[in-house]
Design a protein with these regions (language model features):
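Beta-strand-rich extracellular passenger or scaffold domains
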Residues: 1-183
Length: 183
C-alpha cells in the first residue's frame, strides 16, 4: 500500500507497480500521476486533488476509485478512464469531484454517487460512455458545471436527487435516463 500525504504538490512520472496494494491520496496538496500504473488495488482520494493524464494513472480496473467529500480527480490530456468511480461531494473549492481540465476526456466506467456531487468540464469535451448499463447511479443530487461540454452517452439512473446543469458549456444527454428527482 502507498499513501501520498501533505499540503505540497507531488508529481509521480514513473509507473507505480505495487501489485494488489492500494493507493491513497491524503492532504490538501495535488498529486500528479502521469504514468501507466499497474497496481490492482483500490484508489482513494481522501483530500486535495489527484491529477491524471494517462488512461491507467489510477491503476488497472480490477478495483474501483473513491473520491471523498472535499477531494477531486482532475483529468487532462485526452485520456479514457475505464475505472469504476464513486464520487462524494463537489470537489475542491466546488470545482467538481470529477473535473476535466483540458483535452477531450472520457470515463467509460460506472460513476456512483456516494453523496450530493458535482462533475465539471472546464475545456473541450468530457464524455461519459459506459459500454453497457448506466453511466451514473445513486440517490443523491447531481450537478454538471463548467465552460466545457459534457456528453453522457448512457442512462443516468439516479433516484430522488435533484439534477442540475450550470455553467456555459453544453450538456448532451443521449441515454434513456431514469432519474426521478427534480431537474
Amino acid at each position: 500500500n502507498i499513501t501520498f500525504d501533505g499540503a505540497g504538490n507531488i508529481t509521480v512520472a514513473d509507473p507505480i507497480a505495487t501489485g494488489s496494494g492500494t493507493l491513497t491520496k491524503t492532504g490538501s496538496g495535488t498529486l500528479t500521476l502521469s504514468a501507466a500504473n499497474t497496481y490492482t488495488g483500490a484508489t482513494t482520494i481522501s483530500a486535495g486533488v489527484a491529477a491524471i493524464s494517462n488512461n491507467t494513472s489510477l491503476g488497472t480496473t480490477d478495483a474501483a476509485t473513491t473520491i471523498a467529500s472535499g477531494a477531486a480527480l482532475n483529468v487532462s490530456g485526452g485520456v479514457t478512464v475505464a475505472e469504476a468511480i464513486t464520487i462524494n461531494g463537489t470537489g475542491v473549492s466546488s470545482n467538481g469531484a470529477i473535473r476535466s481540465t483540458s483535452g477531450d476526456n472520457t470515463f467509460s466506467g460506472l460513476i456512483t454517487l456516494g453523496a450530493h456531487s458535482e462533475i465539471q468540464s472546464d475545456d473541450d469535451t468530457l464524455t461519459l460512455n459506459v459500454s453497457s448499463g448506466n453511466a451514473i447511479t445513486g440517490t443523491y443530487n447531481l450537478k454538471f458545471d463548467g465552460s466545457g461540454d459534457t456528453t453522457v452517452d448512457d442512462p443516468i439512473a439516479t433516484s430522488s436527487g435533484t439534477f442540475t446543469k450550470a455553467g456555459s458549456g453544453t450538456l448532451l444527454l443521449e441515454g434513456t435516463n431514469t432519474f426521478t428527482g427534480n431537474t
